[in-house]
Amino acid sequence: MPKVALYNQNGENIGEIELNDAVFGIEPNKHVLFEAVIMQRASLRQGTHKTKNRAEVSGGGRKPWRQKGTGRARQGSIRSPQWRGGGVVFGPVPRSYSYKLPKKVRRLAIKSALSSKVLENSIVVLDNLTLEAPKTKEMVKILNNLSVDRKALIVTADANENVILSARNIPGVTVVTASGINVLDVLNHDKLVITKAAVEKVEEVLA
């Protein structure tokens, strides 16, 4: 089982914590990570693109000139696709790009992401993370104590409003709960700062 240092909010090493091999100690599967990131990014797409077809473009109800006798090619509407300003054939319509990978693949992806952070030595485990009031200054101090000076993902066991409000104005810092942890967030941040209680919750679900 991988062992990592356990810190308090002052940045002091107060011991070690054993992480579950099945969650934090597997060989990261790069292809599964790739598939999971593509899935998440697809779900974030708005899908609000839209073009008008010949029935929706304004105008064009009248035949532009008579069928025969002008010497020009026959035309039925100035809004047919070959005309400038005409309708678009088979253009994009609003749609959802979201899809889901199988549950086993999604679980393997998050375990691979967490294990990669352990291998990179980019995981910081806190014994507890509590703030008496929402103070950005206090959160910055805690992160400095832990030598976290880059993009960081903070994972708490449950939603903590003081922690969320204290971190929301810090560039590159994101707060999620153990139940909301996802591959894109883990890979998109340099450091993973996770509380001991959150570790236990993640292991309970994924082990």
UniProtKB/Swiss-Prot annotation:
Single GO molecular function: rRNA binding
InterPro entries referenced in this protein's UniProt entry, alphabetically: Ribosomal_uL4, Ribosomal_uL4-like, Ribosomal_uL4_dom_sf
UniProt signal peptide: none
Keyword terms, alphabetized: Ribonucleoprotein, Ribosomal protein, RNA-binding, rRNA-binding
GO cellular component: ribonucleoprotein complex; ribosome
Disulfide pattern: none
One biological process term in Gene Ontology: translation
Positions of region (Disordered): 45-78
A Pfam family hit: Ribosomal_L4
Function: One of the primary rRNA binding proteins, this protein initially binds near the 5'-end of the 23S rRNA. It is important during the early stages of 50S assembly. It makes multiple contacts with different domains of the 23S rRNA in the assembled 50S subunit and ribosome. Forms part of the polypeptide exit tunnel.
Similarity field: Belongs to the universal ribosomal protein uL4 family.
Subunit comment: Part of the 50S ribosomal subunit.
Entry protein name: Large ribosomal subunit protein uL4
